[in-house]
């Protein structure tokens, strides 16, 4: 019978070894870190005067003023006044993961009279970036088999891509997601290389933190477990305790969290909107009846109804011209999760200008613009050189897949990529918002 204390000690030892920086990783990782320290400093300087204030409406202050390519500053809000303010069904545990940081920020606000949320987030982002870079290097070197110099160069290339750089300087959920996915790929890649098993507790732990941050990423942990375990994955014990129970538990928790925290707020908001609409109707009705020259009350009511319908239609048309409506594609259906799909935004142009364009090379026009504010969905490069560079990168990407077509690790990674491609490109979730 195994000693649970000894087993727990071994777990912490394994985790500690994974985060130990090796000699040949020091110079590349610190060089990358230096660049990202400068980038984070620029973000802090840009918003410090507004975001360091304590006695303000945090949501309005952060959401209205922060604008970097559409990324959301919700984490700034949560660390300033805690609550499950993320989309709960997409990020079920993220608010709880950052709760200790909220306590830290609250204590610092009491001590200094300043909101130091930017500095706290910057330190976390730099930690995530540093180890994401290291895990990427290790994947290239220890699993793919490249030399250390080549691994450092490829990692440097990845972390020089436009939206990777933005990911690690903005207070969104993408940085922790990327960190955990790279760590999972590294851990599972080593298991495949050494022909070792992915223990149930390892799969569960990775699933909780990955799916808890972004629910859809939990599917990638299931895929990783399948590739590592092979036929053993389908053993009833593994399926039940390492896969089924964590998946069901995560969904139950997200649903319970939604019903407890978000549903009452949404119901109250709908009630407030309804009351406001009724007040507006009563005000308009009274004003119309006081000023109309129609003496017959029934005819006056008909005339008011016609006038009110025109007012509602004009308001609807005006709302449809706003960026968040004008740039939205038509969904597959208008209810449930499928209401977030997009069947009309052009796929080819999305791939050229956004998926393999803006994410790698920022466009000169509408630089760091937001499609929900002031940026068109599609922006073209001024110079043909940008398209040549993009085409070269895509061709190298496809050539790399061909060269690694016999690699189990490659197909494990690309099946996860396939999930993202299906969700975002084929179904169109967030297709009109480049950063997603």
Tell what function each PLM region has.
Residues 176-193:
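Specific aromatic-rich, kink-prone transmembrane helix
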Residues 123-144, 399:
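Transmembrane-helix motifs of polytopic, lipid-linked glycan transferases
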Residues 198-217, 221-229, 242-248:
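Membrane-interface alpha helices of multi-pass inner-membrane proteins
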Residues 24, 230-244:
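Membrane-interfacial entry segments at the cytosolic side of transmembrane helices
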Residues 73-119, 298-404, 409-417:
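Lumenal/periplasmic acceptor-binding loop at the mouth of the active site in multi-pass
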Residues 169-175:
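Short acidic/glycine- and proline-prone juxtamembrane loop motifs at membrane-interface regions
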Residues 136-160, 410-415:
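Transmembrane-helix signature of polytopic, membrane-embedded enzymes
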Residues 17-71, 75-82, 244-260:
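Transmembrane signal-anchor helices characteristic of membrane glycosylation enzymes that use polyprenol
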């Amino acid at each position: 019978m195994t000693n649970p204390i000894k087993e727990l000690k071994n777990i912490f030892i394994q985790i500690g070894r994974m985060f130990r920086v090796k000699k040949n990783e020091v110079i590349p990782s610190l060089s990358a870190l230096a660049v990202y320290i400068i980038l984070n400093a620029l973000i802090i300087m840009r918003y410090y005067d507004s975001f360091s204030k304590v006695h303000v409406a945090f949501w309005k202050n952060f959401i209205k003023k922060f604008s970097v390519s559409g990324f959301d500053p919700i984490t700034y809000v949560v660390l300033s006044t805690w609550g499950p303010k993320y989309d709960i069904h997409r990020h079920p545990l993220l608010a709880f993961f950052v709760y200790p940081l909220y306590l830290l920020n609250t204590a610092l606000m009491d001590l200094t009279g300043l909101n130091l949320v930017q500095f706290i987030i910057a330190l976390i982002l730099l930690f995530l970036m540093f180890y994401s870079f290291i895990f990427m290097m290790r994947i290239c070197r220890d699993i793919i088999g490249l030399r250390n110099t080549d691994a450092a160069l490829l990692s440097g290339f990845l972390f020089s891509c436009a939206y990777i750089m933005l990911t690690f300087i903005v207070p969104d959920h993408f940085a922790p997601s990327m960190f955990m996915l790279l760590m999972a790929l590294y851990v599972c890649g080593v298991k495949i290389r050494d022909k070792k098993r992915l223990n149930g507790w390892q799969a569960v732990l990775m699933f909780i933190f990955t799916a808890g941050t972004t629910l859809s990423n939990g599917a990638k942990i299931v895929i990783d477990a399948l590739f590592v375990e092979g036929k053993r994955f389908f053993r009833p014990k593994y399926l039940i305790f390492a896969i089924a129970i964590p998946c069901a538990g995560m969904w139950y928790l997200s649903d319970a969290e939604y019903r407890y925290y978000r549903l009452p707020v949404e119901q109250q908001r709908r009630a407030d909107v309804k009351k406001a609409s009724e007040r507006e109707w009563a005000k308009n009705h009274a004003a119309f009846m006081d000023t109309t020259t129609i003496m017959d009350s029934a005819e006056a009511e008909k005339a008011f109804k016609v006038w009110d319908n025109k007012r509602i239609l004009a308001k609807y048309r005006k709302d449809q011209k706003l960026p968040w409506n004008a740039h939205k594609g038509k969904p597959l259906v208008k209810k449930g999760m499928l209401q977030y799909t997009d069947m009309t935004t052009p796929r080819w142009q999305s791939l050229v200008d956004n998926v393999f364009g803006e994410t790698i090379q920022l466009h000169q026009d509408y630089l760091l613009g937001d499609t929900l504010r002031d940026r068109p969905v599609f922006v073209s490069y001024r110079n043909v050189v940008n398209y040549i560079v993009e085409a070269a990168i895509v061709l190298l990407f496809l050539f790399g897949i061909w060269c690694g077509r016999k690699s189990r690790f490659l197909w494990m990674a690309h099946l996860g990529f396939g999930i993202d491609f299906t969700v975002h490109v084929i179904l169109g979730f967030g297709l009109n918002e480049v950063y997603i």
